[in-house]
Amino acid sequence: MTERVQNREVKVCPVVLRKSGSAVELLLFEHPLADVQLVKGTLELTDSSVESAALRELEEESGISKVSRAKYLGSWESGFQNQLWHFVLCEISENLPNNWSFYTQDDGGLKFNFFWHKLGDSPKFKCHKVFSSAIKQVEILCI
């Protein structure tokens, strides 16, 4: 796996869920240049674990740092650019709003607009095929 990490092919995806009545919702965001996405980033050689990388990416892209528990869910060969994704369930120790914006330092500073998507529902937003497939993978792992 070290070669894939060096090639920047190994991705970490912190999965943030919440209950809304009987539904389970997944945290997503609208990227100003690339439609709707899940929080995701690259596993670095300096990361001590997949879980620590997921926590780093979650904070970098959303500002969320109060994670009470990180649980490894599984991996997925995405079929996109030889990317291997690792999903990590991140339980948040605070109530998050329905929508919010976060200014990330990615690409010189971008505003990401966060929202919740009900798992099992058809997406009502535009996203790259790898992200729609990743959402389906989260549904398999979590519901």
Model-derived segments and spans:
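Conserved N-terminal beta-strand and adjoining loop/helix that marks the start
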Residues: 1-26
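Conserved Nudix-box catalytic region and its N-terminal flanking loop in Nudix hydrolases
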Residues: 22-64
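Short, charged/polar surface micro-motifs in flexible loops or helix N-caps
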Residues: 20-22, 33-35, 90-97
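Short connector loops at helix/strand junctions that flank enzyme active sites
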Residues: 9-11, 33, 38, 83-85, ...
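Short, P/G- and charge-enriched loop/turn segments at secondary-structure junctions
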Residues: 1-4, 101-105
